[in-house]
């Protein structure tokens, strides 16, 4: 059994020993920054067991989230949330249909849970861009103007590293004797391709305003400022908008630009 208390203590030790521990996480923009923030990414990864994803139907073909992506997102979550090893799919556009009402309905039971958990929104656009948000609470509608969420929320986007680039880097490292060829063999399968890798670009809460989350029966949104939403999805979960905002200091998240078509959308409970 995974020792939660022991892992929590080790995590705290890792963070306290970091040479960069006095840096403000609101300025972190990439997984490279995060590796500096935690002092040693290797020591972090050795502390936590891998994530198990629960809830995909055997018939679900277009799965948006992979365990490797979870490993990129975990460092930005609150320490106790990082310790959860099971992420549960609460809503999937492919499995449950394209409806914001259905999304809210699937998350309704979580509104009364006493446990402290987290929620990850994952979106895929027409150009295969993957992006989304982390929330400290389940998304639920407010018919009157009311923002929710707290400073744990953040926006993110993720890029897969092309296999040919990874393979070229592996060959370069081998030529320079920087890696052990035997250790690297399991990265390459029999077909000669390399397992997919992911690069995270994260946008934590800046403190500029408190417009973390705003949901109604007509739309779901995160982040705002100067008349724009950081991430906005319509009630049919077909169209979306993304803009830079003061709340998260984010860039445009979608590969399509400020307006995008939703090809896939999932909401996961962490814990």
UniProtKB/Swiss-Prot annotation:
Gene Ontology BP term (one): protein retention in Golgi apparatus
Gene Ontology CC terms: mitochondrion; nucleus
Cellular location(s): Mitochondrion
Boundaries of every TLDc domain copy: 63-271
InterPro entries: TLDc_dom
Biased composition (Basic and acidic residues): 23-32
Region of interest: Disordered: 15-41
Keywords: Mitochondrion
Keyword Mitochondrion: yes
Record Pfam families: TLD (PF07534)
Domain of life: Eukaryota
Function: May be involved in protection from oxidative damage.
Protein family per UniProt: Belongs to the OXR1 family.
Name by which UniProt lists this protein: Oxidation resistance protein 1
Origin species: Candida glabrata (strain ATCC 2001 / BCRC 20586 / JCM 3761 / NBRC 0622 / NRRL Y-65 / CBS 138)
